[in-house]
From Swiss-Prot:
GO terms for cellular component: peribacteroid membrane; plasma membrane. Disulfide bonds join C20-C55. The gene is ENOD55-1. Glycans are attached at N13, N51, N68. Keywords: Disulfide bond, Glycoprotein, Membrane, Nitrogen fixation, Nodulation, Signal. Residues 1-67 form the Phytocyanin domain. This is Early nodulin-55-1. It comes from Glycine max.
Length: 137
């Protein structure tokens, strides 16, 4: 929570984030004192304090939201063939094969081009960020 009379949160573009520009036509302004942001799509999100001096002291946050779309991009390897039936026991004892110490290697992870974000997660970090800022005041 933060004091909405003295503070606000701005969602900004990367340039305004880097320059702590608190005035911009494209800014999304939050000033309810208890900001929660839904992360509904992947990509970069930039948040700064609406108080420029606070932003310049480091009160800003960049979030990278990763997508959970690995099911679509998994590389399907052929299913393993059925194990061959074990031979019938022979009358003479034979040494049993030693167990394999190596396990099958896992399928490779998909090669994601670019950075993505988790969808549907509630963004509470802004609240914590502003709480820290209030402690600094």
């Amino acid at each position: 929570k933060y004091d909405e009379r003295t503070e606000s949160v701005h969602e900004v573009n990367e340039t305004d984030y880097e320059q702590c520009n608190t005035v911009g036509k494209e800014h999304v302004l939050f000033n309810d004192g208890n900001t929660k942001v839904m992360l509904t799509k992947s990509g970069f999100r930039h948040f700064i304090s609406g108080n420029q001096s606070h932003c310049q002291m480091g009160l800003k946050l960049m979030v990278v939201v990763m997508s959970n779309n690995t099911k679509k991009k998994l590389i399907h390897s052929p299913s393993p063939s059925s194990p061959s039936p074990s031979p019938s026991p022979s009358p003479s004892p034979s040494p049993s094969p030693s167990p394999s110490l190596s396990s099958p290697s896992p399928s490779p992870l998909p090669n994601n081009q670019g950075v993505t974000r988790s969808s549907g997660a509630e963004f509470i970090g802004v609240m914590m960020w502003l709480g820290v800022m209030m402690l600094l005041l």
